[in-house]
Amino acid sequence: MAKTLYEKVFDAHVVYENENELPILYIDRHLIHEVTSPQAFSGLKMAKRRMARADLTLATIDHDVSTKSVDLNACSDMAKEQITTLMQNTKEFGVRLLGLGDKNQGIVHIVSPELGFTLPGVTLVCGDSHTATHGAFGALAFGIGTSEVEHVMATQTLKQAKLKTMKIECKGQFQKGVYAKDLILYLIAQYGTAKGTGYAIEFCGELIRNLSMEARMTLCNMAIEFGAKVGMIAPDEITFEYIKGKEFAPKGEEFQKYCEYWKSLRSDEGAKYDESITLDVSKIKPQISYGTNPSQVIGIDEKIPKISDFKNQSEQKSLLDALSYVNLEQDQVIEGVKIDIVFIGSCTNGRLEDLKIAADILKGRKIHKNVKALIVPGSMQVRKEAENLGLDKIFIEAGCEWRYAGCSMCLGMNDDKANSGQRVASTSNRNFVGRQGKGSITHLMSPASAAACAIEGVICDNRKYLGV
C-alpha cells in the first residue's frame, strides 16, 4: 500500500497498538529547555525514576535568557531560577546541556539541527509548540506538554493519535524580495489558523525542492500557526549536505548508508492524502500582518480589509477587536505605518541566511533615528559565523544592537520587551495581544522587510532596496 512520508515515519515508530487504544510511539530525540522541564524533572524525582535515555535528550537555555550578556547575573530573578534548576537537573540526570557560555547555546529549534541531532526519519519532541520546525528534515516532530515531557523522560515513548494528511504543493518561483516567511504568512492568510487542525502537512513541489534548509525550517516552523501539529518536507541532497559532518550525524560509510535509507523517506506514488492544496507562489508579494493573529495578513501593497469583506460574524468581530488593539483602520494602507522597534531573530528567522538577507539591505545604510533595532542570532554558532562574515559590523554601523543568542523579543518572557503602544516589525511567528510585552503591537514579516522598516521607520516594501 502506498504511503505518505508522515505515514512511513509514524508507522516505523509504533511499538504498541491495540484496538480502541492510541498507538504508542518510540521517541528518538527529546529536546528540553529551562521553561517546560522543571516540573517534569520534579515528577521523576518524586517517583524515584531515572531517565530512560538521557543520551537521546539535548538541553539548551533559550526562552528567558538575557541576550545582552552571557552572564547569568544579567538575567531576571525568575530566569536565574529556571536556568539554575535546569543546570542542576541536567547534571543529576546526565543530560547534555548547552548552557550559558557554551559555543553551541541557542534556541532549541536552531541548535538541534546545527548539531545534527535532528535527522531525517526520526521522531522528535519538545515542550514547545514550534517543534514542527524539525519536520524540514523529514523528521516527525511535534510539541508536547509538560506531563508528556516527563513521560518521554521516563519511558522514551508517547501515546499519539495518527493525524490526517495534507499535501501543500508549491509551484513556480518567488519574486525578488519574497521569501519562505512570506509564503507561510500568505498560506495562513488565505486559509486561516485552523485549516491545518488535525493534520500532518507535507510541503512539496518545485519551489520546495529549491529551498535551502533554513528556508524549509521557516516553513515548517509556522505550520503550527496554520493549525497543524506537524509540518514535513521529504529529505533530499540539500538535506544530506546540510547534515554531513555535524557532531551527532553519522560519519563516513555509515553516513552513506543512512543517506540511502533517507532517500526512501518520501511519499510513494499514488499515496492518498486527506486534503491537498496547490499554490502558485509566483503571485505572492511581501506579506505583513496587520492584526492580532497570524491569519490577519496582507500584501505590502494592499489595504487592511473592511468589515464588509467578511460574512462571518466572528471574523467581523475579530477584525474590529484587532484593529482597535493595533490602532489601525479598515481600508487603511499598511505601507507607511510608523514603526518603533525592529526585531530580527527567533526560531523562525534567526539563522545565518536570515541575517545575511537583512545585512544585504542594511549594508551602507543607517536605521531611522526613531527606531530601535535588535539583531538576535538564534544560536552562538550563528553569531560566530555572522561575525566571521562581518555581518555584525554591518548591523552595528547601521545603528542596530548586536545581541547574544536567545528567544529574545519573540515572547515577553525575558528582558527584551516592547512598551505598551510600541509597534514592532518582527520576524517572529506570533502577533497575539501582548506577545512582545504588555500592550505591544506586532507586525510579522520577513527579515528583508524588517530591515527595510528599520531604515525607513515605517512599514515599507523591501523590494525598493533590491533593485525591483
Swiss-Prot record:
GO terms for biological process: L-leucine biosynthetic process. Binds 1 [4Fe-4S] cluster per subunit. Its cofactor is [4Fe-4S] cluster. Pfam families: Aconitase. InterPro entries: 3-IsopropMal_deHydase_lsu, Acnase/IPM_dHydase_lsu_aba_1/3, Acoase/IPM_deHydtase_lsu_aba, Aconitase_4Fe-4S_BS, Aconitase_4Fe-4S_dom, IPM_dehydratase_rel_enz, IPMI_cat. The keyword Nucleus does not apply. Pathway: Amino-acid biosynthesis; L-leucine biosynthesis; L-leucine from 3-methyl-2-oxobutanoate: step 2/4. GO terms for molecular function: 3-isopropylmalate dehydratase activity; 4 iron, 4 sulfur cluster binding; metal ion binding. [4Fe-4S] cluster binds at C347, C407, C410. It catalyses: (2R,3S)-3-isopropylmalate = (2S)-2-isopropylmalate. Heterodimer of LeuC and LeuD. Catalyzes the isomerization between 2-isopropylmalate and 3-isopropylmalate, via the formation of 2-isopropylmaleate. This is 3-isopropylmalate dehydratase large subunit. It comes from Campylobacter jejuni subsp. doylei (strain ATCC BAA-1458 / RM4099 / 269.97). The gene is leuC.
